[in-house]
């Protein structure tokens, strides 16, 4: 060997802690929140994360001389304190782009959140954010359609889209399921939806559900003169079965299908997204299992990272929480990852949890989906928070109407249109919410009953995962 090789073990910071390094535009940047074991220096912990998520191993190996380790290694170039947390710190790591397969979110996550999360030197580790370089973004497929194409396909403009999940989500026969879909769509919704765990169970095989849903959609379209859709969940136990279900939805003339992207996996999701673009189908994405990964404030992967990865992997709509409903998520954090789904450029903004500038180039945007414990009284806040390029989904807030699902759908549609009209007239939706809704309720008995039914329903629990900002 032409170079001297010294066997043994050396500290990670001797190789992977490089505070003088200036990241390149082509580097993939990551921010980790690290909590090390007692007595381990911050620099050693951060360097260990950089090493174990890139080229490193626990000992010096002779085969390092066969490559250019200095070119390929991950580098921790900055450490920051976490406001209000004396145990943890932020480690900023730069990875050369050649460490990752082009267009493969699976490969990126395998490196960044792989074995390193079981490292003994760490008590906790959380991936807070990723800056994807433009060279990597251009190699990804992205959303199969995007916001503008979806609006054109559905012929719906100037307002958020309106939907609901069919309830009860499990136990209905295919025919009864289709009946509930019809009631919701004729009442005024744009979409109805399979819940994440409805696939092909003994009480309702997928072919049966697809056929009755297609019948309900076509009948509601004839009655209302509007384009309607239902998120047919094609998530299955094998990719082959998933594509069979997607093909059948296409044969039935359905505009949109659905995938559980975390339980289904990024590889399956990217493949399905490519299929959707080739076959002219919209793709709705459910985030089932996300809270297992993202809810702990010190360990796991923040949802903003999952949202970024989904935009790259492919999807036209993604659940994001509601801020005001029953699910976790504060306002500023939610706005931060909504920006990552929809905007072409998102600047660094710690007040929204964005640690890096993120340039998305010409990649299409993704509709943010608000779903979970919302009802008509939430409509003004939802329209304010989520804006027009969103889908507002009321499950219990539709089916729980005393007069049934059609009346619940009508109430939500009237409330939405009243809020959009008030906003366009320059009114402050959140400050004037009661006046706006009560006035609309005078002309809609369905809305009036809904307002009375849901007036005491609130979900006032504190957020577990809060932004790390200085008070």
From Swiss-Prot:
Biological processes, Gene Ontology terms: photorespiration; reductive pentose-phosphate cycle
Assigned EC number: 4.1.1.39
UniProt entry keywords in alphabetical sequence: Bacterial microcompartment, Calvin cycle, Carbon dioxide fixation, Carboxysome, Lyase, Magnesium, Metal-binding, Monooxygenase, Oxidoreductase, Photorespiration, Photosynthesis
Positions of substrate binding: 115, 165, 169, 287, 319, 371
The protein's assembly and partners: Heterohexadecamer of 8 large chains and 8 small chains.
Annotated family: Belongs to the RuBisCO large chain family. Type I subfamily.
Name recorded for this polypeptide: Ribulose bisphosphate carboxylase large chain
Cofactor(s) it depends on: Mg(2+)
PANTHER family for the chain: RIBULOSE BISPHOSPHATE CARBOXYLASE, RIBULOSE BISPHOSPHATE CARBOXYLASE LARGE CHAIN
Cofactor note: Binds 1 Mg(2+) ion per subunit.
Residues that, per the record, bind Mg(2+): 193, 195-196
Organism lineage string: Bacteria, Bacillati, Cyanobacteriota, Cyanophyceae, Synechococcales
Any GO molecular function: ribulose-bisphosphate carboxylase activity
Pfam family, one: RuBisCO_large
Species: Synechococcus sp. (strain WH7803)
Keyword Protein transport: no
């Amino acid at each position: 060997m032409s170079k001297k090789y010294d066997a043994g073990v050396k500290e990670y910071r001797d190789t992977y802690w490089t505070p003088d390094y200036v990241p390149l535009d082509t580097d993939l940047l990551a921010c980790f929140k690290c909590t090390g074991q007692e007595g381990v220096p911050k620099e050693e912990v951060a360097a260990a994360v950089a090493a174990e998520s890139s080229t490193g191993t626990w000992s010096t190996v002779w085969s390092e001389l066969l490559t250019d380790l200095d070119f390929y290694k991950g580098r921790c170039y900055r450490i920051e304190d976490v406001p209000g947390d004396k145990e943890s710190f932020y480690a900023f790591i730069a990875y050369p782009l050649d460490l990752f397969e082009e267009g493969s979110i699976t490969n990126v996550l395998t490196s960044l959140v792989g074995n390193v999360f079981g490292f003994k030197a760490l008590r906790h580790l959380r991936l807070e954010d990723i800056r994807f370089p433009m060279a990597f973004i251009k190699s990804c497929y992205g959303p199969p359609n995007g916001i503008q194409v979806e609006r054109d396909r559905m012929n719906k403009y100037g307002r958020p889209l309106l939907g609901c999940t069919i309830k009860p989500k499990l136990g209905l026969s295919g025919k009864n399921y289709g009946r509930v879909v019809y009631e919701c769509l004729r009442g005024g919704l744009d979409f109805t939806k399979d819940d994440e765990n409805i696939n092909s169970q003994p009480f309702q095989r997928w072919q049966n559900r697809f056929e009755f849903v297609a019948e309900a959609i076509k009948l509601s379209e004839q009655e209302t003169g509007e384009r309607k859709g239902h998120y047919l969940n094609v998530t299955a136990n094998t990719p082959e079965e998933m594509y069979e279900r997607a093909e059948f939805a296409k044969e039935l003339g359905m505009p949109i299908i659905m995938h559980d992207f975390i339980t289904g996996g990024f590889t399956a999701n990217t493949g399905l997204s490519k299929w959707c673009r080739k076959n002219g189908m919209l793709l709705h994405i459910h985030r089932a299992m996300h809270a297992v990964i993202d809810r702990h404030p010190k360990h796991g992967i923040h949802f903003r990272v999952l949202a970024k990865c989904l935009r790259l992997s492919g999807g036209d709509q993604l659940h994001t929480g509601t801020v005001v409903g029953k699910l976790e998520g504060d306002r500023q954090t939610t706005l931060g990852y909504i920006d990552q789904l929809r905007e072409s450029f998102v600047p660094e903004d710690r007040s929204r949890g964005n640690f890096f500038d993120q340039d998305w180039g010409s990649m299409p945007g993704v509709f943010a989906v608000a779903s979970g414990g919302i009802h008509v009284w939430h409509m003004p806040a939802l329209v304010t928070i989520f804006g027009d390029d969103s889908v507002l989904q009321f499950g219990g807030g539709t089916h729980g109407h005393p007069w049934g699902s059609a009346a619940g759908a009508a109430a939500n549609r009237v409330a939405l249109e009243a809020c959009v009209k008030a906003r366009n007239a320059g009114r402050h939706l959140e400050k004037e919410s009661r006046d706006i809704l009560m006035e609309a309720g005078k002309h809609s008995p369905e809305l009036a009953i809904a307002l009375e039914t849901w007036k005491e329903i609130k979900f006032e629990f504190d957020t577990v995962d809060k932004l790390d900002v200085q008070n």
